[in-house]
Regions:
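Bacterial N-terminal signal peptides that target proteins for export
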Residues: 1-12
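Surface-exposed patches in mature extracellular/periplasmic domains of secreted proteins
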Residues: 102-111, 217-222
Length: 250
């Protein structure tokens, strides 16, 4: 990077940090709610399993909200609130309705017993941050750009007659979207879109495998789901003020 681009970049980063530092000193840490509205891709699938499946997401997991600060060095005094549980349910419904005849959400293993196939999704890992944009964006007029970045890991377990017949976790690559930086932070929509893209990637990779898995196909006509006595609420990392990238269950 030559001096023509280095100094504007340095000044831009300093102004972001300085502005939010003064804001943080004058008041409590600011919380921002990030809307998540997943719209999943269509799968290249031309047939569905002719069975109704249950999507098992406990009430606790449905209400799971990740609350934490970004990793990295930008905007680290902003506490972000992500409704990840709701996004996981909505994204899973859209994705798995493409490979099963019908999908119905259930909250408990007892409800799941009525179904031949049970799909149990969980979010295992999530991280996000803001990066500085490259030289190309820094040269675009007077605008300054930041890059919302996010990745998510999702695990899917499929049960038939109380037995796990398929299980896998997939972590998305880091999804990114350069956007103009707005003082005071007006980029909630953009970071939400990046998170939804990461969630879509993970769900799509697993749905494609499930649709072609012979064991799932063989068990699609099995009788009922038994023995799911365990809770599917996963452990969360406690949010600690001042530590980037941590989250809490609200």
């Amino acid at each position: 990077m030559n001096s023509k681009t280095f100094y504007p970049t340095l000044i831009f980063s300093f102004l972001i940090l300085l502005g939010f530092c003064f804001g943080g000193c004058a008041a409590t840490r600011k919380e921002i709610y990030i809307p998540l509205n997943p719209e999943v891709d269509r799968l290249p699938i031309y047939r569905k399993f002719s069975v109704q499946a249950a999507l098992l997401i406990s009430e606790e997991d449905k209400k799971y909200v990740y609350k934490g600060t970004p990793s990295g060095s930008l905007l680290t005094n902003l506490v972000h609130v992500f409704p990840l549980g709701d996004a996981l349910e909505n994204g899973s419904l859209q994705m798995f309705s493409q490979i099963f005849r019908n999908i119905q959400v259930v909250r408990t293993p007892a409800e799941a017993k009525k179904f031949k196939i049970v799909i149990a999704p969980q979010i295992e890992d999530f991280n996000f941050r803001y990066d500085e944009a490259g030289d190309y964006y820094l040269r675009m007029g007077d605008s300054r750009y930041i890059v919302p970045t996010a990745a998510v890991k999702v695990k899917i377990t499929i049960y038939s007659e109380g037995t796990a017949v398929w299980e896998k976790g997939v972590k998305s690559p880091e999804e990114k979207k350069p956007v103009p930086y707005n003082p005071g932070f007006a980029n909630a929509k953009e970071i939400g879109e990046v998170v939804c893209q990461a969630l879509d990637y993970a769900l799509k990779r697993m749905a494609e495998e499930i649709a072609q898995d012979p064991e799932v196909e063989k068990n699609a006509a099995s009788l009922s789901i038994d023995g799911l006595a365990k809770t599917f609420a996963q452990h969360r990392v406690d949010y600690q003020p001042g530590l980037p990238g941590t989250g809490e269950r609200l």
